[in-house]
């Protein structure tokens, strides 16, 4: 977020402190060395030196550099759209200012996997949501059941529609099982239509929203639907 004429405010998910808010000065200045602003695109991996200010909501960043150069994500509209979605989801869900190393490592791996993918890109955001649920504490509690249904309220697969009827339909339930068992580099083996992706996204956001109110409205979903 631009702040003043030459500064910006950035929301970062860090390895040591979880979510942190930083003020970066001179990022838009013509006198600065290099284009710092380019490093703060959604889901870019950076290494930086910061000045922590106890009890403050905003901290200051001294030096910043690219940690892992991304070769395709900034230039592929499909990947950059997915990275925007990932960033928004994490912004809404990760509120803690404390370390969460497993989640941090998963997010970093996911960014690198997306950048290197050549097949299955259109399914990556669906896979990311499914895998993310494991790090947020509500991954499906049992193995998929053939021709079964996923109980959104209970968080488990059932052989029939639960009495409360808050569940994924059979098609989305089957896809959930497929994505639970699928590695990112095999996403190209799932031939999904635009309608299937949209329906599954709706089901997953309903599942997330049932457990976490913060995810109920994700603005970047509309952009995903236009592209995928």
Regions of interest found by a model, annotated:
Residues 1-228:
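Non-catalytic alpha-helical scaffolds and adjoining flexible linkers that form interface surfaces
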């Amino acid at each position: 977020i631009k702040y003043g004429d030459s500064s910006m405010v950035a929301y970062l998910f860090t390895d040591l402190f979880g979510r942190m808010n930083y003020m970066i000065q001179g990022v838009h200045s013509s006198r600065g060395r290099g284009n710092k602003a380019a490093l703060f695109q959604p889901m870019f991996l950076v290494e930086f030196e910061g000045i922590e200010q106890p009890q403050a909501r905003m901290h200051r960043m001294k030096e910043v550099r690219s940690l892992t150069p991304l070769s395709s994500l900034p230039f592929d509209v499909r990947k950059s759209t997915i990275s925007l979605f990932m960033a928004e989801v994490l912004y809404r869900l990760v509120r803690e200012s404390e370390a969460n190393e497993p989640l941090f490592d998963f997010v970093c791996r996911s960014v690198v996997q997306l950048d290197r993918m050549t097949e299955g890109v259109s399914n990556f955001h669906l896979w990311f949501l499914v895998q993310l649920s494991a790090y947020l504490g509500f991954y499906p509690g049992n193995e998929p059941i053939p021709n079964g249904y996923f109980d959104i309220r209970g968080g488990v697969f059932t052989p029939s529609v639960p009495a409360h009827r808050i569940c994924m339909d059979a098609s989305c339930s089957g896809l959930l099982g497929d994505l639970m068992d699928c590695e990112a580099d095999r996403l190209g083996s799932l031939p999904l239509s635009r309608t299937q992706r949209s329906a599954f996204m709706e089901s997953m956001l309903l599942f997330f929203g049932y457990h976490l109110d913060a995810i109920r409205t994700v603005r970047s979903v509309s952009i995903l639907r236009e592209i995928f």
